Amino acid sequence: MQKKRVGKSVVAALAIIAMSAGTVAAWADGAPRTNDFWWPERLDLSPLRQHDVESNPYGKDFDYAQAFNKLDIEAVKKDIRATLTTSQDWWPADYGNYGPFFIRMAWHGAGTYRTYDGRGGAGGAQQRFEPLNSWPDNANLDKARRLLWPIKKKYGENISWGDLMVLTGNVALESMGFQTFGFGGGREDDWQSDLVYWGAGTKFMSNNRDKNGKLEKPLAATQMGLIYVNPEGPNGNPDPVAAAKDIRDAFGRMAMNDEETLALIAGGHTFGKAHGAASPDKCVGAAPAGAGVEAQGLGWANKCGTGKGADTITSGLEGAWSVDPVHFTMQYLDNLLEHDWVLTKSPAGAHQWMPKDAQDIVPDAHDPSKRHPLMMFTTDIALKVDPAYSAIAKRFHAHPEEFKLAFAKAWFKLTHRDLGPKARYLGKDVPKVDLIWQDPLPVAGYQMIGDADIAELKRRILASGVPKAELIKTAWASAASFRATDYRGGANGARIRLAPENDWAVNDPASLSKVLKSLEGIQSGFNRNRTDGKQVSLADLIVLGGSAAVEDAARKAGYDVKVPFSPGRVDATQAQTDVASFAVLEPTADGFRNYYQKSNERSPAELMVDRASKLDLTVPEMTVLVGGLRALDANAGHSRLGVLTNRPGTLSNDFFVNLLDMSTQWTKSSSADGTYEGRDRKTGALKWTASPVDLVFGSSSELRAVAEVYASDDAHEKFVRDFVQAWTKVMNLDRFDLKRS
């Protein structure tokens, strides 16, 4: 299981216990105060300690892919179909079908994904945990998951909650007459809440915009506790024009263009209804996280009427978009475009819209003798008044088959966006077609190089005249573009030679171009006129070059080590690389290369931890990599900051030895912002310069404890071997083929 972690520092919640029957309260006395309570500005390393294997009850040797592949997926689908139309008295199905309810569950599970940092999404099934299980926009989805518990219980380890929720959404669509695009399994479950920055607000429904009125990065939802946008309009203001702007911003940050956005909303609102039988403020109790232990994880208890069925309260909006909410039809677009809509209010007092010539034509969800008018949200009307959305809606309305395909593909993208490349997909229902957002790779049509070839290629690379530091920087830049949050980036594909990566400032484009040109020459020379069918990709050669340089640096330190290398990477084409999609992977800070853009709002050290979490690193791995890369002179821009050694290019522990040397006194530079000077305590002579990232390994008590290990006299070999191990891990982060072989 890979880690999908944070943003900003997270203060641990106070422990809670049952104080008496039916009550849950925080300890008034005896609860431990976290260090963040006393020193909120301390560097938080918890992102690097989340989702460790000890929290997984299946154990470290559990192979989810293997378990999933034993699953009879058709049997699971059959059980889901039976559940859809088996209404339960404790939570009756609208129109006798839970399909729309399960679509909302799957949508909201996947819809937290955001492109800027790759966090959120269906993977991990985080909808089960706080805060998502108690977000206002997820009201009553606790019941949807409980309805699925008998199926999860039946199949156990063979299907994760993440896969089951998405699969259920698919089956629900199919059971109501819609043809989905496919399904890929592979979402391993998490066992604790992700540490994710969801916004600065301290109250639900607070605005997620910055002081300039722009939606804060990396967020996608416009208000705290929402998946996308406020259905009543921005901050509850029923302005369709403003709502269209919010929709475009929010869905765009979730990787959807205008056509995909329109297709998703129109397709999703074809089904089901909204629930606002009465005022939530007067009727609805605490969310699951705030409910008593006797509620057993359920929340939003409704004391009005029966509290369920016709009396259900979820969003406060009330009604359906069509007269047949449990079948796929074109009625949503028919109704949106053909009616004139006027503003009204739901029984709960929420802003919504009804036809100007409203008639009671919609069947009641529970009483066949009743009928109701159609309704639309402000965000639905936005699709009619916005020129771009309106044009797409009219085109889809005129061409139903085009709409069906667009919705099918958009739904597939929504529910699979955070699963990563197609190589991670499991099951027989995976579509054969490659989609550009999956970051496709070509299939190698040649034999892989062997040990003798690898040795010869390393010899040629080291003899090429390319500086060893540049080989290391290039390999690191290529591999460290990976992020474990959505499994994008990495060395496979050699996209560092393509736009936009080849022009990223952190990659030193001018130097990078020279290295790539040299490696391409070696590649061409090796591949030319081969008769044994073997070829080497540039992607493999980039990693091999860095590894050869690391081995050379280790030899200079007196250690003969072999950096593990597994060929098999391929070279993507520019046509397989969506420039706009890859642009969000560009780092504005990389502590491993001492790179930091001053436009960042968070500190260099915080962003280093965030970067390390995206590389799935532990605290010791992050520490040894920073120290090693400094010794190898691998900073961006050829910066000398943190190169605390008189023998750069030697894989030594000098960074830690010199950082912890008490003969050096550190002060802020008076001439260079963000720079610190290390001077001899006695003479005042300048010895070193460093960044805040460098110094935090001496100032943070937890990082210093690890740094002391690597600075010790007996740690020279340990440092080298730990660095090689961590380096290899980063080089192989996107080698999903190795992890399943």
UniProtKB/Swiss-Prot annotation:
The protein's annotated catalytic reaction(s) are: H2O2 + AH2 = A + 2 H2O; 2 H2O2 = O2 + 2 H2O
* Signal peptide positions (record): 1-28
One Gene Ontology cellular component term attached to this UniProt record is: cytosol
Annotated cofactor note = Binds 1 heme b (iron(II)-protoporphyrin IX) group per dimer.
What cofactor does its activity depend on? heme b
The alphabetized UniProt keywords are:
Heme, Hydrogen peroxide, Iron, Metal-binding, Oxidoreductase, Peroxidase, Signal
Tell me the active site: 108
Entry protein name: Catalase-peroxidase 2
Biological source species: Burkholderia ambifaria (strain ATCC BAA-244 / DSM 16087 / CCUG 44356 / LMG 19182 / AMMD)
What taxonomic classification does the UniProt entry list for its organism? Bacteria, Pseudomonadati, Pseudomonadota, Betaproteobacteria, Burkholderiales
